[in-house]
Amino acid sequence: MTMPYYASAEQIMRDRSELARKGIARGRSVVVLTYRDGVLFVAENPSRALHKVSELYDRLGFAAVGKYNEFENLRRAGIVHADMRGYSYDRRDVTGRSLANAYAQTLGTIFTEQPKPYEVEICVAEIGRFGSSTPAQLYRITYDGSIADEQEFVVMGGTTEPIVTAMRESYQRDLDLESAVRLAVGALQKGGPAPAGTTEAEPRTLDVSALEVAVLDSNRPRRAFKRIAGSSLEEMLPTPAATEDAPPANGDAPS
């Protein structure tokens, strides 16, 4: 008689975690950071149609890495959740914390009850109401439903260690938009493999066509989300020489 296959609950959870982490690590990285006027999203994403960064509600933004079809389902569900709550109660009742909790419950349920976990990691960003001094808030939600709040920046997907190191070395809370873009792009350039025909010592260069950039701008009265592309983005990108310089003083363009 053939003995049935047995795996302990701990082993099953470890296998699911490993599957999800590997899937997330295969993707390109995303950096979300707070700056002087709100929240900046910078994703390495050559696609013009399949977005990693999007608007959720008036003052809420969304960023994700992993399997596109999975985080797109989560994004759309989040928009429906926010719209229904805002319509049923008040637009001010739609908060980043409520959406982050909803995402955490959904991902936690999928991780424990479904045959395969979602291979995604997401960030919900929130800025205060127009005219308020409420600081921006970032919520990171992982594949197993774990949730953490951040005040400065979040790095997700790909090879995160060199990106996190670069961000920690140069990040400052009151960066202007251009400095924040240069910092995030410079950090992303350190996170991927060296281009073919170059050595690992030579940094990558990410141009406008390889980036998806957006902001939650606290100076906008209602819908704070805005994409930055084309010539507006190109003017903000760091030059190759600038990425090799030491981190500048506050107000200058960081590497």
UniProtKB/Swiss-Prot annotation:
Post-translational modifications reported in the UniProt record: The N-terminus is blocked.
Notes on how activity is controlled: The formation of the proteasomal ATPase ARC-20S proteasome complex, likely via the docking of the C-termini of ARC into the intersubunit pockets in the alpha-rings, may trigger opening of the gate for substrate entry. Interconversion between the open-gate and close-gate conformations leads to a dynamic regulation of the 20S proteasome proteolysis activity.
Domain of life of the source: Bacteria
Any Gene Ontology CC annotation: cytoplasm
This protein's record includes keyword Transferase: no
Main subcellular location: cytoplasm
Pathway membership: Protein degradation; proteasomal Pup-dependent pathway
Region Disordered: start-end pairs: 229-255
Biased composition (Low complexity): 238-249
GO-annotated molecular function: endopeptidase activity; threonine-type endopeptidase activity
SUPFAM superfamilies, per database record: N-terminal nucleophile aminohydrolases (Ntn hydrolases) (SSF56235)
GO terms, biological process: modification-dependent protein catabolic process; proteasomal protein catabolic process
The keyword tRNA processing is annotated on this UniProt entry: no
InterPro entries reported for this sequence: Ntn_hydrolases_N, Proteasome_alpha-type, Proteasome_asu_bac, Proteasome_sua/b
Subcellular location: Cytoplasm
Keyword entries, A-Z: Cytoplasm, Proteasome
CDD domains in the cross-refs: Ntn_hydrolase
Subunit structure, interactors included: The 20S proteasome core is composed of 14 alpha and 14 beta subunits that assemble into four stacked heptameric rings, resulting in a barrel-shaped structure. The two inner rings, each composed of seven catalytic beta subunits, are sandwiched by two outer rings, each composed of seven alpha subunits. All four combinations of alpha- and beta-subunits (beta2-alpha1, beta2-alpha2, beta1-alpha2 and beta1-alpha1) yield fully assembled and proteolytically active proteasomes. The catalytic chamber with the active sites is on the inside of the barrel.
Entry's family note: Belongs to the peptidase T1A family.
Function: Component of the proteasome core, a large protease complex with broad specificity involved in protein degradation. The R.erythropolis proteasomes are able to cleave oligopeptides after Tyr, Phe and Leu, very poorly after Arg but not after Glu. Thus, displays chymotrypsin-like activity, low trypsin-like activity but no caspase-like activity.
Protein name per the record: Proteasome subunit alpha 2
Gene encoding the protein: prcA2
